[in-house]
């Protein structure tokens, strides 16, 4: 097996946090919101210029496609809150049993939710390395 030897280096610590969420798609955004709402110091890293992942970057527009079956039980939670906030702004379209969100308005909704929760937002960044002692 080949190895790459890296010289010792000093890397400045940009910030410290209790919870670091990398990626702000529906799952990452929900995880960061849940942690911050529990009072935990939370940072959210996103490589693009806005939060929302597939909702805002690929124009999928929904996270509830699974509701097409009438037997589906919806757990509610933060995903339902995304939809409710979009409805309040007339920024969603009901199709069958789910909502298609206006992707541009959802960018604003996601920003507001991040700010309201007190999350430290980090846009246009990627995670390269986590130091071993703090890896979880």
Question: Where are the regions that the model predicts?
Answer:
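Short gly/ser/thr-rich secondary-structure transition/capping motifs
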Residues: 1-6
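Residue-level detector of conserved catalytic or cofactor/ligand-binding positions
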Residues: 126-136
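Beta1/beta-strand and adjacent pyrophosphate-binding region of the FAD-binding site
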Residues: 13-25
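N-terminal Rossmann-fold NAD(P) dinucleotide-binding loop
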Residues: 28
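Conserved N-terminal/central alpha/beta ligand/cofactor-binding core
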Residues: 8, 16, 34, 40-41, ...
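The Walker A (P-loop) glycine that initiates the GxxxxGKT/S ATP-binding motif of P-loop NTPases
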Residues: 22-23, 46-47, 132
């Amino acid at each position: 097996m080949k190895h790459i030897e890296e010289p010792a280096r000093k890397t400045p610590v940009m910030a410290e946090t209790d919870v670091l969420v990398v990626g702000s798609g529906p799952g990452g955004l929900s995880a960061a919101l849940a942690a911050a709402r529990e009072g935990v110091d939370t940072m959210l890293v996103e490589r693009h210029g806005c939060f929302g992942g597939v909702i805002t970057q690929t124009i999928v527009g929904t996270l509830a496609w699974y509701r097409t079956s009438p037997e589906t039980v919806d757990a509610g939670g933060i995903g339902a809150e995304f939809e409710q906030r979009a409805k309040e702004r007339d920024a969603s379209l009901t199709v069958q049993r789910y909502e298609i969100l206006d992707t541009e308005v959802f960018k604003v909704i996601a920003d507001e939710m991040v700010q309201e929760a007190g999350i430290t937002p980090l846009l246009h960044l990627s995670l390269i390395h986590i130091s071993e002692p703090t890896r979880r």
